[in-house]
Amino acid sequence: DPESKGTIALWQNIREFLDEEFPDAAMVSEWGEPDKSLIGGFHMDFLLHFGPSHYNDLFRCDHPYFSKDAEGSAKEFVAAYQANYAKTDGKGLICIPSGNHDMDRLAKNLDTDELKVAFAFLLSMPGAPFIYYGDEIGMRYVEGLTSVEGGYGRTGSRTPMQWDDSLSAGFSAARKDKYYIALDESADRPNAKTQSEQEDSLRSEVKRLIAFRKANPALQSKGEISFVSDEYPLVYKRTSAEQEITVIIN
């Protein structure tokens, strides 16, 4: 079934059941192929770090597009995104997550300033925003951790949330040897409490970007998009019935 026709039909049946029994529920696919998953009945689809989307070109490669060295490329990502957008417009949402439990952390390849620019992109694109816990404070990928239940190389992206600057990061009162996965033990590990008190922190910037998105219909999930430039800077227009906004990511 190279075109996934049988799989699509199965999920269409599940969507029909869901609409009848749980009309307020939403289905989110982890396919990274919105041209198939949204037709299959999912309300939204994640782009993933593998497959044809070129999502990795933006954040997770030797020369990410959002790196200061400006040696990356968004061309193939934009081309793939536009193709999927044309196929799926009106059928559901294409979502670009900051990360998830299977990917390296954003902060593995990007510093704080670069992360701010990356979040400006993520929070000005169509689709529902998905921010993996801790990405909003720049939690790091922790190297060298013992694999837990098949985590292998993904384990470093699954460490406990860092709430404050206490020894346990505000995560648990348990002894550290009882933790499911070890904490980031770095002395300068970021935490939510400290960043909430800093106007120039990554968390504060993400909070401002979320508020700006919520205040502008063109930037929200269903606002339309058209790309003006796929080089440096990345330029696109977001439009709704109420407004048009030109986004320049530099």
What is each PLM-predicted segment?
Residues F22-D24, D89-G92:
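Short helix-terminating capping/connector loops at secondary-structure junctions
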Residues T246-N250:
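Asparagine-centered strand-capping/turn motif at beta-strand->loop junctions
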Residues K5-W11, M44-K68, R158-P160:
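Acidic, His- and aromatic-enriched active-site or binding-groove loops in soluble protein domains
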Residues R15-A25, G32-E33, G41, H49, ...:
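Loop/helix patches that line or flank the sugar-binding groove of alpha-linked glycan CAZymes
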